[in-house]
């Protein structure tokens, strides 16, 4: 398969241009080259997508779990069959290395569809005989039409995280990928458009300031689901609250990656890199606040600098590349601006800290793997989300000081602990105000493990069957077993 010159909207089972014919350019962030044009949806297009989803939902909600499971598994099979193509498109459109898209993004997306197929085949309602007179039946029913908006950092995987529960629950969706990275999702729907019920999933591409706003405020939606910044997530929550509909939100983070002096050094260095260099640091749960025990600090920093200095940055399509391009030059400039902010605050650059322009990377948006040292937890670089390959290193003396600093953050999405003392690891994990804690690893995201945040990092948990509670509504049916009148109004 080759990329199309122009991609339309996918509404009501058909591909079509935006009503006004407007398009946006999709570019390769690694070299600035034009990839394709994508439709820039109008408000009328969004209205059509919602109407199509409503009509589809009214039919799809009556399907059996077996039928929905078969559809989910079929989508997973198609993803696996075309994983090389989809991985290449993802790398070209996003800038992340092909070794990540081929081994993580695409296969994990397929796994997600299969996971929910298995979940719904095993799920059951409940019945409770309250006493000899009453029977209570509890059912879960589809919530309806869901508006879903995902970011540019994991476009394909985030699509799976959002769409698999929609299908599993019996809902319908109006789905908006980021205008920066729509191509992998559009390519997937070129592959599955014929197997989907008409109007079940509608893909609306375009600017977040336009189509994203129209989805956010549309009165025809029964639920909103969003992954992205905390600032926009707050707006989504307010919009949902005004209409008294639920919203699930997976938002920003400034996660702590903790290294005790008894940590295995090789394991710790691996976890450090997984935490802040994976996907060029453009990960909501990136281990960007690096807490190192004082007695381990010098040894750890010396080894970390050597590791960061040898990271292969370059062409995302080269299988040997370990770190690719940031999403665009604006993002790269923002990351480097934070490095300057850190320096002004008193931090020192131990390694990196500049744009990477060697080996033909001057046309892209590459940033060197970076560590800032001599950082204190009150600095902006320790409190604000940089969203790039920049780790800030903070010393700690003991557990009490550590936990106080770790929890001194508006966020609570992820965190990591590296130690050979499992009792200490569990004790610290229980003390951390965060939704996910990795022990002696980082950034593992398997289906079946709930992912989501405390505090300003969001509402709800994804990648686990618990999310189906957010995509369904509970119905209780109460049955009288006596066959007699109550006598409450006897004359």
Residue spans for each PLM region:
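Hydrophobic face of amphipathic alpha-helices that form TPR/SEL1-like repeat modules
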Residues: 1-30, 354
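N-terminal alpha-helical segment of soluble enzymes
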Residues: 13, 27-94, 295
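Conserved C-terminal structural/oligomerization subdomain of aldehyde/semialdehyde dehydrogenase
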Residues: 31-37, 221, 258, 312, ...
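Residue-level signal for inorganic ion chemistry
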Residues: 32, 68, 90, 113, ...
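Short, well-ordered beta-strand elements within core beta-sheets of diverse protein domains
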Residues: 34-41, 55-62, 148, 257-260, ...
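Long amphipathic alpha-helix in the N-terminal Rossmann-like dinucleotide-binding domain
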Residues: 51, 73-84, 98-123
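Rossmann-like NAD(P) dinucleotide-binding subdomain of oxidoreductase/dehydrogenase enzymes
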Residues: 125-267, 396
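ALDH superfamily catalytic-core signature
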Residues: 231-376, 439, 486-490
